[in-house]
Amino acid sequence: MTDDRDKTNEDPEKIIEADFNPEDPDDADIAEDAKEGLVVATDVLPSTLPIIPLRPRPAFPGILTPMVFTGEKHVALAKRAVDTPSKMMGLVLAKEVDEPDSLENLHRFGVVGRVMKVLHTDDDSIHLLVNCLERFSIRELTESEEGLFARVDYHYATELSVNPELKAYSMAIITTLKELVQINPLYSEEIKMFLNRQSMDDPGRLTDFAANLTSGDGQLLQEILETIDVRNRIDKVLVLLKKELEVSRLQTKISKQIEQKVSAQQREFFLREQLKAIKKELGLEKEGKVSEIEKYQKRLKNLTLSEEAQKTIDEEIEKLRLIEPSSPEYNVSRNYLDWLTILPWGKFSKDNYNIERARRVLDRDHYGLKDVKDRILEFIAVGMLKGDISGSILCLVGPPGVGKTSIGKSIAAALNRTFYRFSLGGMRDEAEIKGHRRTYIGAMPGRFIQAMKSAGTANPVLMLDEIDKVGASFQGDPASALLEVLDPEQNSSFRDHYLDVPFDLSNVLFVATANQLDTIPAPLLDRMEIIRLAGYILEEKLEIARRYLIPKALENHGLKKGQVTIRKDALRAIIDGYAREAGVRNLENRIKKIMRHAAMEFSQGRTDKITVSKKDVAAILGKPIFTEEEVFEDVPGVVTGLAWTSMGGATLQIEATAMPSRNKGFKQTGQLGKVMVESSDIAYSYVMAHLEEYGADPEFFDKHFVHLHVPAGATPKDGPSAGVTMATALLSMITGKPVIKKLGMTGELTLTGKVLPIGGVKEKIIAVKRIGLTTVILPEANRKDFEELPDHLRENLSVHFAGDYRDVYQVAFG
């Protein structure tokens, strides 16, 4: 059985309270009969009762309880009780709501009830109005095919002499009930019905009524039902009523807050509507649609539109006039017009082609990078002669942290143009570039049209960051969509899917950035002018730290100039031990950590000035990440190669060894990529074919198994430039001769012994200087690259250029 106060638990066979209306004549007669005592405690009650399990709360004596019986078993039991002369049944609370009916799942106290009214329905359920009479305890409980039956002992309500204490407690219950009625009027009808049937001078009946009135937990109510002593029962009911009172107060408070909020919103709505009507009558405000159209027409006066765009906007405005504002199509049309009229059609910022000013801006924002700055100044000079720099698409390629993005900002500042940047990294949807068609819900233009809106001019500098990291998926290939945008012959009439009218992007200066070119599709790469940023050498990093990074870090950490001094030897230690990458991002992070350390010292009053020297670096920054690169000298079969990664230059110690074996063979280890494995195979074949020429045993490979290893084994490696180094390691191992001291080499080797050019000469020379090598072998074709390096990189180096491996051999083995 459930009632309106608790309907959270449902059971396939259950009994719930039905509607009982005291205004109904039949129901009123029943109530009157109960009041007149047609069923009273002195009636003879049967000693054996059919038991109906109740869920989720018990019934109480003296209460008229409407019930609905569902489920074949419960309906049969109810009908059997109705058909008996006494029309009585035992109502007992089940222990567990979700458990089926059983002997173990029943409490041992219940209420006997007499059926007062029966109503049959078409849904195989039966509605009863039951007058609950007296408590009983179960003496014996049995189960048969017909259901549960119990022999019971009744606990009749006895007339008590109402002493002052009981009367006081009864008045406390009545007072609490009155408070409940004042807070929640829903209780008033039930209290009125009770007063019509019972006397307030009966404390027992009063406590039962009060307990039944609450929404307490079923097990707690069962405990009250089982309390025979009226005085103890009153204590428990009073506690329950106080809780009910607090809940009712809280519910009332919440209801009032909600009503006040709703009322305030309604009041504000009505006032706004009245204000709108008053303004409309005074001519101070026009209808929303009219004002929207006037807004678009006002925008159009300041734009220079193409013929197609003008026609499209005019047609869309006429369409908007005919659409009701409540229509979903109205918002679609309005958003479309918003985009069309907010774009900078024909709006240009005036370019500044002053070369000296551009040079000052570039020098102010960046240290070094002379070749890059010269290329940008040349680019601006050409624009000055032509009168515009339309159709230009630059691609800045270099390691992370070398200033690619900031160079784009400097270009915009030098030209007096608006700068806008967005990242292409991880973009996998072609609609991100060309927009979504307006038929889709939530459609919007692509990133380029959004950028033009944000820039506010038709000739901004748009930076396409991380263009080498564009992806592809089933939603399309953004790199292919970029072909139209970055083609000077096509982007003058770029057609976004959302706008569906051509927009001129030919006056935009596109500046793309990338860490590498390998992942950029060839057609896209062909449309861009490549400018390489090789990275910074140690001396440049020192100067960048002194001029830019340290002053910026001081300001960002609330420190004054002179409070923190980082000596040059400390900066060198930081660069060598913590920030060897080509850029300065890690160097900046380490300087920030020093500033945070200083801020902590100052805030705790330990000192007011800090000077950081080389010996202090490890204490502040922790153990160095990079250790000194060890060069193995006088060891046959070990040669130092030069490598180039996206993080800058590095050295590789290539090792070769051989084991006497009847089964000749060759294997490589060290996580080598496909290209590097091919280079090792070429080196192996070349050495095998020229053993006699280099004074080695021509049958060496027939009698040995050869192993080539490139540490560190956990780091993946690839590229063709280690070919000459691998061949030299093999020859050194076979002949037993070590190479000369402090030697590094790089170059791609062919099967015929030709040495082909490689990339990253500057980065590799930086690595050479860092570990202290003095002799370097480079491909002859890279002579020009080496000669373009700054003097401080070339000095104190003995550089040999090789066009054939024989040149390498002569230098390596003296």
Swiss-Prot record:
Domain Lon N-terminal: 49-245
Location of the region described as Disordered in the Swiss-Prot/TrEMBL record: 1-28
EC number, UniProt record: 3.4.21.53
Main location: cytoplasm
One Pfam family cited in the UniProt record for this chain: LON_substr_bdg
Triggers of expression: By heat shock.
GO molecular function, one term: serine-type endopeptidase activity
Keywords: ATP-binding, Cytoplasm, Hydrolase, Nucleotide-binding, Protease, Serine protease, Stress response
GO CC aspect terms: cytoplasm
Catalytic activity: Hydrolysis of proteins in presence of ATP
Active site: 721, 764
Keyword Oxidoreductase recorded: no
PROSITE patterns for the chain: LON_N (PS51787), LON_PROTEOLYTIC (PS51786), LON_SER (PS01046)
Class in the EC hierarchy, top level: hydrolase
UniProt cross-references to HAMAP family, sorted A to Z: lon_bact
Family from the record: Belongs to the peptidase S16 family.
Protein name in the entry: Lon protease 1
Lineage, top ranks: Bacteria, Pseudomonadati, Thermodesulfobacteriota, Desulfuromonadia, Desulfuromonadales
Gene for this chain: lon1
